[in-house]
């Protein structure tokens, strides 16, 4: 058995928000293509996630919001949920499997079955707030997983690391202010979601990078800020919102990370 589990589901490829949307099935297709080409597929156990439990959803999101998503799932076509976020007939079910992957991954690690887990899921989650969607996100997968670890296993110190080019505003909305969570969030400043990035919750460290920042700056932040804080915090579990859109070839952002920077992370 491998020491890494890899979660994905066929429904993740069926969730679509219209033509030319950057959050598209090709994101996951490319991951699996590259894993096969590099030969890394043989070193992971591929698993299908369960659907998230209602209790886990309600730990992170308001009941009215969950009901709203359920009742607004369309039978055909697209239903716009917020200015940039829409559902097709597969979205709601896919979102529940995506959050279920986060919880199953937590179970796998905390039970000792695996050392680490990668969840290749769609829709993403870190812009989903307690009571509303946004930024292509419906359920906050990492927040649901973190609260699952706390609620089910009694963890006292969970670290959430977010290196997506966009600030994880939804994650801070749900987990901000908790004594049992540490949030480390590095992102491009003056970019969506244009949040109040200079007013971090007491349990969060925000590291905004100006346009044109190269990967060496993020590496330095990891060495000089994040790693000392993690060592001081002594997390029982580390969860990562692993967005790779700070890459220099990303059209919708202006950071300049390259492959070796992500390998370092």
Regions found by a protein language model. Give the residues of each.
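HDAC/HDAC-like amidohydrolase catalytic core signature
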Residues: 1-161, 165-265
